[in-house]
């Protein structure tokens, strides 16, 4: 099981980004959480099987929300997420 932390900036708050991210995660069997940060970014902590997590990461990069737009994306491997 792989565990990652992602920070996403752009139009990611107030557009359903976290809700749609949760829907994608549920479809792929990914567990975790997404939080709005004061700086306007969203931080996502996620874990799941490698192949499903890779698909999830690609969908987050493309913005799962129709009105969202990802300006930057950082990924950190994070084995401490539980």
Language-model segments: residues:
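Intrinsically disordered, low-complexity, mixed-charge
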Residues: 1-82
